[in-house]
Amino acid sequence: MIDPKLKRALGQAAKGVEIVAATHDGVTRGYTSHWVSQVAFEEPIVMASVSPKHDTYPLMIASGAFTVSFLAGDQIDIGQYFSYPAHRFHYIAPEYLTEVNGHPVVPDSLSWIHCEIFETKELGDHVLLFARVTDFGYGRLKESPLIYSSRHGWRVANDKARTPGESPRDALLARVAAAGFDTSAAGSDEED
């Protein structure tokens, strides 16, 4: 178990927010990530870190590929929709993922890349997936990206930190509850 003080120290880094998704045998899953990095330039290679316990991981391995959508600052609701602990609601709002060139992509994201996995490495409680970028697209490149840090939460560059109690995630959970689903296990945005 990680020391809470170390967790807080590591959480100070602001990171871009991405949705990592994979499709295999007609099933698509996705999750919010801050742990996707470009590791080579001349040959575009990225690394994604994922928990093998996540329901997207088996699809990534079985398909040998994944797609990363980079979120814009006005896509907080999408980032929170695919984030833990509301993971069991990921698949009741198909408007958040669409298919582009056969890849699961967040509509109107800043850009997206499709990656073919060529190497994996188990490291601690996660698996690092090294992949070549084989397809890409972009949309709103002039928009500010969505960023996240544990200190300030979901933000857009140069924005103030969100006000507690005004979470788009909580609004989404209210929408899910109104549709008749039990959201009691989803927790609160104010936890941690």
Where do the PLM segments sit?
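Basic, polyanion-binding surface patches
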Residues: 1-192
